[in-house]
Amino acid sequence: MSKKQKRSTINDLKNILETIEKIDRFIENMDFEDFSEDEKTLFAVSKAIEIIGEIVNHLPQELKDRYSLVPWEDIYGMRNFLVHNYFGSDQDEVWKTINEDIPDLKPIIQKILSEEMKDKQTDKPE
């Protein structure tokens, strides 16, 4: 991976983490009932999940292969589900994603980011 690709990948991983943190802020102190009745939050969280999926789709295949235990296809699949669900988000599925999948994803992305940043520091100049 070139230095430019590495820098772009690191920025993408940081953007995923920032988006996860936004989701955390959006749903802070909410239960499912509050969430399902709050159209703005449902829309914002759905959009954030779409963004994460889109970033994942553009990560280098080399990185995805190296971290093959990460459910990259499922992450992008959720993005597709939300984007193509024209008649409104499935609140149950979004709630499940933000309470079960996103919390598991955050430490994984943090670890990958840490490793990629460490690798960047040890890369030889081009």
What are these regions (language model features)?
Residues 1-126:
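Solvent-exposed interaction patches of small proteins and small membrane subunits
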